[in-house]
Amino acid sequence: MSMQDPIADMLTRIRNGQAANKVAVTMPSAKLKVAIANVLKEEGFIEDFKVEGDTKPELELTLKYFQGKAVVESIQRVSRPGLRIYKKKDELPKVMAGLGIAVVSTSKGVMTDRAARQAGLGGEIICYVA
């Protein structure tokens, strides 16, 4: 049985891993997942990530905690396979009044809502992270 929504699976693994105070979580790797992990690392929501394996690459995310609490308070899938959500540059949402981020897939790659606004790009809203 194939996975219907691998991005939702990735976000769920992060959410469950932090709820269980895990140091790291692993999942099957894909280019989009690596791009999302890169954005999460740049924004300080995860410590690090690495891709291991040749035939079946695995993505390992090292989760981040501050004073024993998970850095990621909430992580929510927005655009999904059954209902894609696209926004123009002027319509990009501000998550928690700018405290969180929206991960956006644009024509120039995956980036935060802030970076997309500065670049004058719209795109598909993948998820909200706060």
UniProtKB/Swiss-Prot annotation:
Cited Gene3D superfamilies: 3.30.1370.30, 3.30.1490.10
GO CC annotation, single: ribosome
A Pfam family annotated for this UniProt entry: Ribosomal_S8
GO terms of molecular function: rRNA binding; structural constituent of ribosome
Keywords: Ribonucleoprotein, Ribosomal protein, RNA-binding, rRNA-binding
Keyword RNA-binding: yes
Domain of life: Bacteria
GO annotation (BP), single: translation
Subunit organization: Part of the 30S ribosomal subunit. Contacts proteins S5 and S12.
Role this protein plays: One of the primary rRNA binding proteins, it binds directly to 16S rRNA central domain where it helps coordinate assembly of the platform of the 30S subunit.
Family: Belongs to the universal ribosomal protein uS8 family.
Protein name: Small ribosomal subunit protein uS8
Organism of provenance: Enterobacter sp. (strain 638)
Lineage: Bacteria, Pseudomonadati, Pseudomonadota, Gammaproteobacteria, Enterobacterales
